[in-house]
Regions:
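N-terminal small/polar loop signature for handling phosphorylated ligands or for N-terminal nucleophile
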Residues: 58-141, 281-294, 300-301
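Internal gly/pro-rich beta-alpha loop/helix module
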Residues: 112-113, 118-214
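Short strand->helix junction
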Residues: 78, 120-125, 159, 165, ...
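Small-residue (G/A/S/T)-rich helix-start motifs and N-terminal tracts that mark the onset
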Residues: 1-75, 82, 86, 174, ...
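Glycine-rich phosphate-binding loop signature in dinucleotide/nucleotide-binding domains
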Residues: 27, 31, 107-112, 143-145, ...
């Protein structure tokens, strides 16, 4: 804890314990536990011997003081406990709390709520055999007696940074976490096991408690409302921007159409779609009339007067595409959005040192092989794997770290499309999307996102704000559709619903 805060770790622990209590009261009438289960029902705290367990002891003490029946079971060797755990255990004993070692406890039938505080945020590898056995017992008893299970800060077995889980990790009903939601609770598989996350205040600015670190922010309606702007009454198509989408090939006509139409639906003043001349007539017959269609063979004229160029949807992977992409990058000096086949054409733009990544040596993880213009890049995991020459399984385990280092080293805005999608900025800030649904897992969704981001850039939003807004509006549109059908809605449906989300953000 930074000394300049003037707040001791003991005080923060006391605040954390009170936060657990408040979270429990927020979900239950703790004075009525006996009515729900039996006359002897209680809240069970399962505490390890470190500071995470000490947080649980503080909470148990406060609940007991309030007249709520509690019991405490201890996991581990108390002779090797942390100093603060020893202090909190002494206080609980002085108050007369019921405390047993875990292997001596057998009153599961009267447990109304169980709160697990075995280890907290410290895990980076496997769980100890003892912890696995305890968690297995908890899961068995929960199945038999149907009590809710809470985690303190993060579930035992969950890596608080990467979201990866160790073998034996349980699925929880709730996690009460302190100061700010832990990154691992937003990333799969951690998000799937953490249950409902409740953030409890620490009583000190959490940014200062955590120190000078790269920032991770959640993308939600509150953030999007701060970014969206009202239009001036005199707005016209020139004010609202001129966007160019480049893409399409003989085999992929739909992708650039989706992107261009999404740019229109997100509010761009003028949208032009550049496609190969051989498919121009077909595209004109299928696209909405608001989009003008030109051909890419005359690309110098095509680029003139654009506020943004988005390139890649359906572009193809023929041998001439890398040179074409390079020619656009050399010719156009304005804002760019690179997606799909434009990313493929770039090849390997960097490399990752697996040993440094495994060891957490952040400064040595990533090496740039190709300089990139300041742009928005929107790869999915497969495309990102090719860009950094690293297998997808490694990316999944180090999702945020790799996104952050890529954006910092290349000085680009990276929209890494996954579950969840993240936006990484050149300054090291990472935004994690908190909305969206499984119905978005269909071809063409990424093309719509590219068009949305380009549409916002054309209207004068910065690249980073356009990326964050684009991710939110795209996902929120899908969530609105999800209210009426869980899946089966199309990327075109998402595109046409974008205006509803923008109206929602503007309070109209």
């Amino acid at each position: 804890v930074p000394k300049q805060l003037g707040v001791s770790l003991e005080i923060l622990m006391e605040n954390a314990g009170r936060g657990i209590v408040d979270a429990l009261w927020g979900q239950y009438d703790l004075f009525s536990l006996d009515n729900a289960r039996s006359i002897n029902s209680f809240v069970l705290f399962i505490c390890g011997t470190g500071n995470n367990g000490a947080d649980g002891l503080v909470a148990a003490r406060h609940l007991m003081e309030q007249g709520v029946p509690v019991q405490i079971v201890l996991v581990g060797d108390t002779s090797k406990c942390s100093d603060l755990f020893a202090l909190q255990l002494e206080r609980c004993e002085a108050m007369g709390c019921i405390i047993d070692m875990y292997d001596e406890f057998n009153d599961w039938s009267n447990v109304a709520v169980a709160v697990e505080g075995i280890m907290g945020t410290g895990l980076t590898g496997k769980l100890r055999d003892l912890t696995v056995d305890v968690l297995h017992d908890i899961d068995t008893m929960r199945s038999q007696y149907n009590f809710d299970l809470w985690a303190i800060d993060v579930p035992a077995g969950l890596d608080a940074t990467t979201g990866q889980i160790a073998e034996g990790t349980l699925a929880y009903d709730y996690t009460v976490t302190f100061g700010a939601i832990k990154q691992g609770l937003l990333l799969y598989p951690g998000k799937a096991v953490g249950g409902i996350a409740v953030v409890a205040p620490l009583g000190a600015p959490w940014q200062q408690v955590l120190g000078d670190r790269d920032i991770t922010v959640t993308i939600d309606s509150d953030l999007a409302e701060k970014l969206i702007n009202y239009r001036i009454p005199m707005a016209h198509k020139g004010v609202n921007g001129n966007a160019l989408i480049i893409g399409g090939s003989n085999d992929m006509i739909g992708a650039p159409i989706l992107a261009a139409e999404a740019a229109v639906h997100s509010g761009a003043g003028k949208v032009t779609l550049g496609v190969p001349e051989v498919i121009k007539q077909v595209v004109q017959g299928r696209i909405i009339p608001e989009v003008m269609v030109t051909y890419t063979e005359a690309h110098k004229a095509m680029l003139e007067g654009r506020q943004v160029v988005a390139m890649g949807p359906g572009l193809g992977r023929t041998s001439d595409i890398p040179d074409f992409v390079d020619s656009i990058l050399d010719s156009y000096e304005g804002p760019l959005v690179l997606d799909a086949d434009a990313l493929y054409a770039l090849g390997h733009v960097g490399s990752v040192d697996k040993d440094a990544l495994r060891d957490g040596d952040i400064e040595s993880i990533y090496a740039v092989k190709r300089d990139l213009p300041y742009c928005v890049m929107t790869p999915h995991l497969g495309e990102f794997s090719r860009l950094i020459d690293l297998p997808i399984k490694w990316i999944e385990r180090h999702y945020i770290t790799l996104a952050r280092e890529f954006a910092k080293e290349h000085q680009v805005v990276l929209v890494l499309k996954g579950i969840p999608s993240v936006v990484a900025l050149p300054d090291g800030t990472v935004y994690i999307n908190t909305i969206g649904n499984a119905g978005m897992g269909t071809g063409g969704m990424g093309d719509v996102l590219t068009g949305v981001i380009a549409g916002f850039i054309s209207q004068g939003y910065s690249l980073q704000d356009s990326a964050v807004l684009g991710v939110y509006v795209h996902s929120r549109s899908a969530d609105i559709l999800n209210d009426t059908k869980a899946w089966g809605y199309t990327p075109s449906d998402v595109s046409t619903s974008l205006g509803c989300v923008i109206s929602e953000l503007l309070g109209e």
